[in-house]
Structures are given as C-alpha cells and as structure tokens.
C-alpha cells in the first residue's frame, strides 16, 4: 500500500489523515460530510490506498460510498483501539492520525459489514423471519 487513510466521520464534518508506508503524515483535511466531498478527497490521493474508519452510525454508508475508490477498506472496532479510546479527549485530527497509524501497523480489529447484495439478503431473511413469527 502506498498510502493509508484514517477517517474520523460525524454527521456534520469528517477529518481524514493520510500517512505513507513509513508512517509519515503526508496530508490531512477536514470537510463537511457529503458523498461528493468524501469521494473527491479520497480520489485525489494518489497511489494504492487503504482506508480505515471506526464502527459507528455512518460506517456502512462510508463503506458503500468509498470502498470502490480504495484497494483496502476496513471498518474497525473502536473498543479495540485503546490508544484512541483510553486517551481521554482527542480532537478529530488526533483521532484520525492515531487511527491511521494503528491501521498501517496492523493493530486494528476489523468488523465485517455486508456489501449491497449481503444487505439485501439480510433484509429478505429478516422479513421472512418476521412473517414466520406471526
């Protein structure tokens, strides 16, 4: 991987930190959260890239929005990222920088999220289950 991306996302804004293969910070940005802004920023990063975002309300949306723009996409368990969670207050940039360093080093724990087909299958199964309980 040429570049590693850590994404700290909220409903209003997102902060993104980028490091190279040596762990040196090569860029960061903060923007309003929108599909257009996320795609624009991630697409502008050159080279093979991987992205990590912590599990949260927007994680599945981020996956569906960005996974085709990166070579590796990971949603990780925030409880396992003790360097971030045990540090007390972290501003968004510090959180994104710590996340990307953990991701680059292989210290994050991935959480599986379904793709579009998997989501449709899950909805169908849950609908069937609900109908069979009646």
Labelled PLM ranges:
Residues 1-134:
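Phosphate- and other anionic-substrate recognition elements at nucleic-acid/protein interfaces
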């Amino acid at each position: 991987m040429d570049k590693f991306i850590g994404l700290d996302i909220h409903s209003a804004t997102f902060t993104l930190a980028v490091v190279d293969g040596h762990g040196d910070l090569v860029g960061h940005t903060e923007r309003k959260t929108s599909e257009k802004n996320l795609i624009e920023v991630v697409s502008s990063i050159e080279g093979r890239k991987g992205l990590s975002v912590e599990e949260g309300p927007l994680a599945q949306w981020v996956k569906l929005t960005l996974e085709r723009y990166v070579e590796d996409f990971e949603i990780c368990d925030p409880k396992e990222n003790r360097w971030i969670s045990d540090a007390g207050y972290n501003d968004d940039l510090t959180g994104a920088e710590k996340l990307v360093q953990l991701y680059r080093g292989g210290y994050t724990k991935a959480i599986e999220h379904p793709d579009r087909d998997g989501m449709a299958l899950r909805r169908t199964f849950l609908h069937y289950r609900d109908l069979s309980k009646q």
